[in-house]
A protein has these predicted regions:
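A general alpha-helix detector
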Residues: 14, 96-99
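Short amphipathic alpha-helical coiled-coil/interface segments
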Residues: 104, 111-115
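C-terminal cap/loop subdomain of S1 sulfatases and analogous C-terminal strand-loop tails that border
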Residues: 1-86, 90, 121, 125
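Cytochrome P450 catalytic domain signature, combining two hallmark sequence patches
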Residues: 44, 108-109
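Intrinsically disordered, low-complexity polar regions and short flexible loop motifs
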Residues: 93
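Short, flexible loop/turn segments with low-complexity composition
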Residues: 123-134
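Active-site-proximal N-terminal segment of extracellular/periplasmic enzymes that hydrolyze or transfer
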Residues: 98-106
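Basic/polar N-terminal segments that are highly enriched at the extreme N-terminus
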Residues: 39, 133-136
């Protein structure tokens, strides 16, 4: 078990490393190499952004996870936008059951600034959920 931040998209960079293949450098990649984590070391990711389609739903930074919006599942009622984001310390509350937003406004402020910086620099890609490839 590891508390390091990782994602299934990291399999891409990890597989390249295992195979001895260089990653493409003609585009920005979100994948990171997990080999340091898999061999008992620290990971390279400190922050992770949770999207649903084009919507930034949440951000994780270190032990903290903050939800701007929540939604149960695709096809369910529209997401709930939280005027004050929900905040959880995943080190002590991995089930995200104790909202700490009122106790830690400084963390809300810090993560909001990180999310804004990310949003200002991110270039949206076409949605794979809204685009269908027609069979020939």
């Amino acid at each position: 078990v590891s508390a390091e931040i990782s994602s299934t998209m990291d399999i891409y960079a990890t597989a390249h490393d295992i195979a001895g293949i260089d990653l493409p450098n003609d585009r920005e990649l979100d994948s990171i190499n997990l080999m340091p984590i898999l061999t008992g070391g620290k990971g390279d990711r400190e922050t992770y952004f949770y999207y649903r389609g084009y919507r930034l739903m949440a951000i994780r930074h270190g032990s903290w996870k903050m939800h701007f919006m929540t939604q149960n599942a695709y096809g369910q009622p529209q997401p709930v936008t939280h005027e004050v984001p929900l905040l959880f310390n995943l080190d002590v509350d991995p089930s995200e059951s104790q909202n700490l937003a009122e106790k830690h406004p400084e963390i809300i402020e810090k993560l909001t600034a990180i999310a804004k910086e990310h949003a200002d620099s991110a270039e949206p890609a076409p949605s794979q959920l809204e685009t269908r490839i027609m069979a020939n």
